[in-house]
Amino acid sequence: TIPSDTACFPAKLMHGHVEALLDEGVDAVFYPCMTYNFDENLGDNHYNCPVVAYYPEVISSNIQKLKDTVFIGDYVGLHRRHDFPGKMYEILRRHFPNGTFTKKDVKKASDAAYAEYDLYMRAVRAIGDKFLALAEEQHKPVIVLAGRPYHVDPEINHGIDSLICDCGAVVVTEDAVACKEKKFPTKVLNQWTYHSRLYAAAKYVVDRADKRVNLIQLVSFGCGVDAITTDEVRG
């Protein structure tokens, strides 16, 4: 069902993931299109990359078994917290006209999801601060290991974080330090949320002006836009 060998590995994984869900007999698959990511106030805009944003369109056109179940591939905007619950209610009502859920139910679930996301991001930053303080206290080098969210997956990162730690360095991720920077000028159009984090993490390292603090950017799967991000991060 994969239409192109040039699709990145995470995109290819989605085919198997959806097939596995269908094999388990689920009555619906929720995989929405998301043009925008959350606005972290670091860039000129806050798009998702085209694969993240629109791959549900590819999935719905290439996995024939989806025709036999409910596929929720509608366009949603998680960045619009104020009207997301209403939009989500309309989508769910369209797919499940006889569902017993109410607008209040969807609002409650949405609020809980946003609260959990905010809690998670605060935890990531707090742990980052903890390990930065540890490195300062023990005079250890710091590596900001910067990449995309999928690099957290052990299947993809192959334990490079542990390898760096075994070399005596303290590792933190780009989303643990990017928040320490304000929006700043870049040489390229800074319009993707994940890229904005990369650039902010690189600036954080430069602003520290400490030779013990360095950045490693992980680049995988021949991602086309990383031809741009790598030059900007290096610059």
Describe every region a protein language model picked out:
Residues 1-235:
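An N-terminal assembly and electron-transfer interface module characteristic of large anaerobic redox
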